[in-house]
Every structure is written in C-alpha cells, then in structure tokens.
C-alpha cells in the first residue's frame, strides 16, 4: 500500500510536456506539479465573488480569467457569483471588486489605501483573497498578478497595494492598411507575420486575434494601443474603416485596453477635398473637429491620437510655417471635450550635410522642441525615443527629457528588434532600457531620473507615460520568436514599475512560459541576460551605434552605410580616427544639451564612460580607453567575445530538451543555432572593415586568421563561378561562388584524422529555394534547402550580403586525412546556390 501511494505521488508530480504553439504566451495556466500544490488545495478558496461588475467590462473579464486560470493551474473548478454592491460575503472566497463598491458593501479596508488610477490592492492572507481595484481595470490587473503568483507556485500570504508608475502605458503597432502599397509591407518593422487588424486597405473581417492580444496587454498592465502605423494612411478615417475601428475597440474594451489611432496630418486634403491642411485654417479645424466627434460617437472611450509630423516625409504644420505645438494643439482641442489625449512624436529631423562638422541629427529633438516648452495644451504628451538617434544598441538618454519641464512627456521604447536582430537573434532588452530609465539627468543639480521625469514626478505633471512599439502579427508566437516575448512581457512590467529588476522579470516570464523547473528558469534567464551585451559586442561598441545597414534592411552588418549620406547616423570613421565629436568646445554641441552636471561629464574624454566614448568624441583608433585598451583593440576583442558568448547558447538550450515541449524546443533551437552562425558573420564583417580602414592589426592575431577555413573559391569548381559580394567584408576573403544551375565544389581535407564539426557558410536570399548537399567521400553528411525565410522573420535580402549570409553545421563527423569533401548546390528561381567557405573545426573550437 505504501509503495502504491508513493508511485501515485510520483506520477502526480510528473507534468506531461505537450506541444505548444506559443499562442498563449505567458498565459498558459499550465497545471502545477503536485509537489508545488501539496498542502495548499484543501485551504484554497472555493468560490469567486464579483461585486457589481459591468457587462463586458474588465471586472467581468477578471472573474472569468480567475476561473480559467485557477482551473488550469490547480485543477479547481470554482463557483463564480456576481453580486450587487450591497452584498458582502468573503469567507473562503476570492473577492474581486472596485474600491468604492467594496467599501460600500464591506466597510473600509485596513490599512487605508492610496490607490492611483489603475492601481489595486491584493491580499492573500487568511482564508480569503481580496483583489480590489481603484477602477475595474485595476481589479483586472490585480487578478492577473494573483494568477502569476499561482502559476509560479507561490501560495505565500501577501497584502500590498500596487500603483502604476504612469497613467499612459500603451502599445504602438506600426500596422499598415494595405501591405501591397505600403513601403514596408503589412507591418513596418514587424517580424511576426501580417497584421491582425488590416488587410487590403480595410479592417479585417476576422478579428479573432484582437481579444487575445488585449488579454496579453492587460496581463502586464498595459492600458492602451495605437493600432496603425505612425506613417499613417488617411484612409483609416473613411466611414467603412471607422466602423471597423468600432469593432476593434469593442473587442479590446473587456480587457481595459483603450484604442488610439495614428493620424496623417494631411487628411483634410487627402480625404476631405480641402485645398489645405494648415492647422490654423478654420476649415481644417472644423474638419478635424467633425471627424473627431464622429469617431467618438463610434468609440466613446477612444484613448486619443498619435501624430508623426514633419519627419521622414510625413506632412505637418511646418509646411505652413506653423509650430509643432500649433499642430499638436489642433488635435488636442478636438479630443479634449471627449477626454482624449494627443501623443505628438518628438522624432523630427531633417536630412543633413556630413561635410558640416557641426551638423548632428542627435540635436534635432531639442532643436525642434525646446523652444516650444509650455506651448502644448494640457492633454498633449510629447513622445520621446529613448535615445537621440533611433533605437540603437546603446545610446545616451535623449537630452529632450531634461528640456521640457513645462510639458508632459512619454518615452518610446521598441519591443520589436528593428536594429537589434529582428527576433532572429535573442536579445533581451530590459537591461538596455534601464540604462535610460535609470539615468539621472541632474536637472537643476538635483536627482532627476528619466523614469521620474516620465512619470511626471520631477516636473509635477499628471500626464506621462510609456509607448512600446510591439508589432505583434499573425504568427502563433506573436513576435516571430518564443524568446522575444520576454521583451513584451518586460515592457509591461517596466511601464508599471521601472525599478523592477531585469532578472526577476525574465525569471517570472520563464516560469509562466516554460514551467517551474529550476534548470529551465536559470538557463533561459542566464542566456537572456547575456544576450544584449553579446549583441552589442558583435554589432557596435563604445556608442558607435549598431553598425547595421541603415540604407536597406536594418538587419545585417554594413558599417559603411552609416556615413556619406544625409541620414545623420554617422560614425565619421576614416583611416586614423572614428566617432562623433559632440562636444561644445569643438563639435556639434550635443553634450551641451544636457543639464550642466551631465554636460560637463560628457564634454571630456576623461569623464565620459567607455561605452559612450565614440558617441561623444572623435578620437584616434589608438586612443586609450579607461579600460586601458585602444579603441581598435576594444572593437576586435568585443566582437570576438560577443560572438563567443552566443556560441554557447545552443548547448545550453539542448540541456533542456527533456523539459520543453518539442514544438517550442525545436523552434527556439533553430533560431539559436542560426544566431551562432550569423554572429560570426557580424564579427568578421566589422573587424575586417575596421582592419582595412585603420591598417592596425589585431594584437591577438584573430582577425584575418582563420586556419580552419577552406575558401569556396579555392576549391575545385564545376558549374560554380566566383562572384563578388557587397559589402566585400560580408564574404571571407571577399569572394563567394554561385550557380543558377547545379554545381559542385570539391577539396581534399588535409587535417589529422579525428572527429570534427563541418560548417558551411552560404547565402540564403528570397524569391527562390536553392538546395544543397555536403558529401564526404561521396557519402552525404546532410542535405538542406535555402528556406530560412520559412523559419525566421527578419527582413530578408535579394543580394549576397551580410543579411543573407548564413551557416549550417554538422557535428561529430569522423574525418581521415585526405578525405574528399564535396558540396553540391542547385539554384532555384531567383535564388542562386551560393557558398562562402567551409570550416573543418576540431571539437570545441569556434571558427
């Protein structure tokens, strides 16, 4: 009998691993193992009591979510009762209510609560649970937090109030109405499939993904969403689409998510047959007032408008010599009677002349907006990107945060990894974001963290907040990557509490997404926390920016693209020196845009931190950093260290194979293995570029020294031709081989007999599917297709370059000296079979 009981206990503790697509993200509500629930179920509340819930409101969603979550996590099917505000029975119950209703029914809570808008009180002490929101939305947030504790096996008694750091916590989607006519497809900088909202210029009939998205947003405390691209299509405002907007808002409303829209400033001219869009013209004012009134008729709780104006070709008030504030206030006055707000982006800049030493895109936000401080209406938020340029791998906090004391502001973060690996690379972003949120601007020589400026605390504003460019799509993983969802989760957590710890956040996300196993949690957390420093290491260092191709995909390496154009993301690199001189004394003056204490620090190399040295200073490659290294040697070392870090990710993930469902395990492994290869492409391209430019060798003799490589152009070729690659540093030794038909490349292996890893670096472009076979002495080691576009979501290339460069590896291959290695490639449609090199790597050696 004892043996049987132990066996049953053991079986109950085993949680089966089922295939999962990722659609539920961190809201899986997976059953806890019995070891985590032992001793807690008998005393668990047996019913959910909802006080005075409005129909289809957040309180009703909270009760249904609690029922669903508890049934999934604990296997308990609790009774749910909805009661009016005059009833109060809380014994062994989970009571969920707004504060006013609860206190009216049950008396004052103790201790006295100071709940802000959307805040909540959560108590799990005693035999009952109290989830009390300042409003219905707050109660929903409290319910999700309680379910997070349960999902992590945390049954400890708690009693606390939680308030959001800022009232505005929005998702921004850059979805386009019509993928066929938009410059960047269905979702600009989206890597998780097509839009969940739009199709062929209209709002989709099938909006079934919308409430699922709303649920995810609400679960991390996000209360608003702008559904369309800031490069807005005026046709969103036609009557057909406004009816569709109502349908979207109705689906988000139960989750407490208010819908907002991006506007095209020229809409009165585009849609309204007016001859002007001058914001001070009476006919334009009337057009916007009437249009806004109509929108609020359909969507009475519309969050408001988001406006991108006079930037990157978008129309705006400067066309008519009106100020940006006058442009913002046009919309602010239209939405003010309805309680809406206007978010006006500070991302305004002009094309610049690089020959002008003083020209600097980083100055643009302050140049355009500082003089307008105090001229914006009270319901306007100026939305500021976290850094002065554009979502780079490292930037200083935008100085504009310290230059608008009379204006409410919000920060714009980018969850989608536009410049940071586009979800094909694991890059966990909170450590990057916290370098900005935790930066002290020292306004008037007093403590003034960016996070406290955003909240309104420093300058006394009621309005303030966060915008996260998330860009989910129709892919089951939402963002195109299971691990990238940690960034969406973390964005919500940091918008609620910007002091939250990055490791705590990713560990919570991991438990909810992949389970409680300690090895799973520690492995994913460790990889995640190493990922941003690694990506910075093999992409762009010392504040030089990401060094990606800014003229094409924003994905692979192309450091030359930064310079010799008007975009202003310059490195000013030549054969002797590198970096932007942003000093007041000799440069663009950008350092002087910061408050005095910070400006003095950034003005001098002696007090500028190494990680921003090239952002603020133009120095020789031989300049000695605080670390003691020269700039160029730091580049070499950082790129090799960063790439080496991610080489360890696949092995770490493989150690979890028995603990992760097969579907997600394989999907993540594919991306991590891809990242190991692409990080080497990055490493080699950047180090080779600056080795060529500076003529300074790597002190450790790694750059240009690849003893395990066999260049494809040096093999015996049949059917292949030697081709150029551009940029040249995107190919080892600057050349590749390619064929439109079928070709073979053959060589004899002059290596000691033993076990090796065979790696093939090739190119995978879109618009075709080339096929490959690698053979040893005529026997196939493996076949594959150039079809990575079916597994990866980044912006693909039609060229042989650093975007299309990719690697495949075959481990544990036994080779004898003199063996014949052959690669057979066959082109297909527009894709040539193209090969860069082969590496024959001793076990444990990184190329």
From Swiss-Prot:
InterPro entries: A-glucoronidase_C_sf, Glyco_hydro_67_aGlcAse, Glyco_hydro_67_aGlcAse_N, Glyco_hydro_67_C, Glyco_hydro_67_cat, Glycoside_hydrolase_SF, Hex-like_dom2
Name of one Pfam family that matches: Glyco_hydro_67C
Source species, domain of life: Eukaryota
Residues annotated as signal peptide: 1-19
Chief place of localization: secreted
GO molecular function per UniProt: alpha-glucuronidase activity
EC numbers for this chain: 3.2.1.139
GO biological process, one term: xylan catabolic process
Principal EC category: hydrolase
Glycan-linked positions: 52, 238, 321, 353, 586, 692, 740, 767
Subcellular location per the Swiss-Prot or TrEMBL entry: Secreted
GO cellular component term of the entry, any: extracellular region
Coiled coil region boundaries: none
Catalytic reaction list: an alpha-D-glucuronoside + H2O = D-glucuronate + an alcohol
Protein family: Belongs to the glycosyl hydrolase 67 family.
Function: Releases 4-O-methylglucuronic acid from xylan.
Protein known as: Alpha-glucuronidase
